[in-house]
Amino acid sequence: MGEDMRGVKVVSKWPPMIVMVTSQVAMGSVNALVKKALDVGVNHMIIGAYRMAISSFILVPIAYFLERKIIPKITFRLMVDHFISGLLGASLMQFFYLLGLSYTSATVACALVSLMPAITFAFALILRTEKIKDLKTQAGMIKVMGTLICISGALFLTFYKGPHISNSHSHLEALPHNNSDHNTKNWLLGCLYLVIGIVLLSLWILFQGTLSIKYPCKFSSTCLMSIFAAFQCALLSLYKSRDLKHWIIDDGFVIGVIIYAGVIGQAMSTVAATWGINRLGAVFASAIMPVSLISATLFDFLILHTPLYLGSVIGSVGTIIGLYVFLWGKNKETEADITTLSSRMNNEDQRV
């Protein structure tokens, strides 16, 4: 009987695992395709605005049918919180992230996203939600070591571009034709913008943790965030251009990318991530982040014929190693907490 129950538990984990891995594969392809659309010259915040608007359109019926009976009363404070959520996790984040993507590559962007757990951990220390004394434990030291490895990989990826390791003939059209100093400056600037975007996303995770307690309906919450973010992205697009004709996109490829990014990259990925995290936990969600990096690299290299650089490969590997070291420490910390809780309960039972 026990073996049958364990078998059922293992089988029940497969659907969310498959969904989350598929979601990460899709996110890698979204980054690669959006990068190609940005290369055409489209205002990156117009892409962001359309993406968030499409996400809102998709999530409205889902939120209505699944959460209409349990949605809490919408107060002014909750509206302000969702406005801030949209600013941190969508509009302002996309402003820097997509700008950085336009200067670098989908591979670099996905690699730097692997920094997010380490950055969130650093902010948790600064904001005192993570206790300094916990760093003296074995799990704490492993988490710090993982964070440092992550940062080292990101720095290597940023400051060492290296030679391209793809076939020079098949990828000739993707190589930049500007002078090398200008390319290096753009590369460094792009990495800086990406890191700023990921820092904003990390702050959003911390903020969202508080918001989800006050407003536990994830679909309608994401929908509200997307609506606010769509308007915010539209305002931020004025930074680059105030000409309304730029909102009229007649390139079929770019239109397809925007629809794909809105439906798959925003709405469906959010739904998949929410369901998967509820079923398997946030640690597993972080553990499969490198799947998007592999997906973006293969999509970039094999389909879009983007050149692959040695520095990107080495830095990406270092960042992924750091991520898994960090998650190893996080897992040990969780095990220690469970052991401590179990011993306390046993002591209380003995007293009774």
From Swiss-Prot:
Membrane topology (UniProt): Multi-pass membrane protein
GO cellular component, one term: membrane
GO molecular function: transmembrane transporter activity
Cleavable signal peptide: none
Keywords linked to the UniProt accession: Membrane, Repeat, Transmembrane, Transmembrane helix
Segments traversing the membrane: 14-34, 46-66, 83-103, 107-127, 139-159, 187-207, 219-239, 253-273, 283-303, 308-328
Pfam families: EamA (PF00892)
Locations listed in the record: Membrane
Domain EamA: 27-157, 192-335
PANTHER family assigned: WAT1-RELATED PROTEIN
Family statement drawn from the similarity comment of this UniProt entry: Belongs to the drug/metabolite transporter (DMT) superfamily. Plant drug/metabolite exporter (P-DME) (TC 2.A.7.4) family.
Protein name: WAT1-related protein At1g11450
Species per Swiss-Prot/TrEMBL record: Arabidopsis thaliana
